[in-house]
């Protein structure tokens, strides 16, 4: 699963470059201030009643590519959507992704480089090796949900949409 490999790889790279406690998170004196904890396990300010375990994830990784084998030069496109307080950690996530490409992704340690980064409107954030922060434009969660609803096949036929969250049993 590419999303799991990317998530695990990002976490590993963030720990590698930011952890001062030998990756012993449970006993770390600095866990409340830890960048890795803030990005990978972003805490709710107010925890909704339907959340029964764990904390929020401060981002979503989406990958529609179901290809299992990649050759040199093949592209893997994915969306990394940051939420809440994770939005300000874009640079750290980008550095972790760059480091992951250098060290390799997955069981075969496939090396990669970042060829393009775009915002949701298609404007380049990465241009000729430079980051254009003015094109990094945070939006409200509502706009993400509304955009995803337009991708739902029956969205135009519905006047009211309800999301029901089920916690694991």
Language-model segments: what does each one mean?
Residues 1-169:
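RNA-interacting cores
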């Amino acid at each position: 699963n590419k999303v799991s490999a990317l998530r695990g790889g990002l976490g590993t790279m963030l720990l590698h470059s930011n952890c001062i406690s030998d990756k012993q998170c449970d006993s770390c004196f600095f866990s409340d201030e830890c960048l890795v904890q803030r990005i990978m396990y972003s805490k709710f300010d107010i925890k909704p009643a339907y959340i029964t375990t764990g904390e929020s994830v401060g981002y979503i990784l989406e990958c529609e590519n179901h290809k299992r084998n990649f050759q040199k030069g093949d592209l893997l496109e994915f969306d990394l959507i940051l939420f809440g307080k994770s939005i300000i950690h874009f640079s750290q996530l980008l550095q972790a992704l760059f480091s992951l490409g250098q060290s390799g992704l997955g069981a075969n340690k496939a090396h990669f480089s970042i060829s393009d980064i775009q915002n949701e409107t298609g404007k380049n954030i990465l241009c000729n090796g430079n980051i254009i922060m003015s094109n990094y434009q945070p939006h409200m969660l509502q706009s993400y949900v509304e955009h995803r609803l337009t991708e739902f096949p029956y969205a135009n036929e519905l006047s009211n949409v309800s999301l029901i969250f089920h916690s694991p049993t």
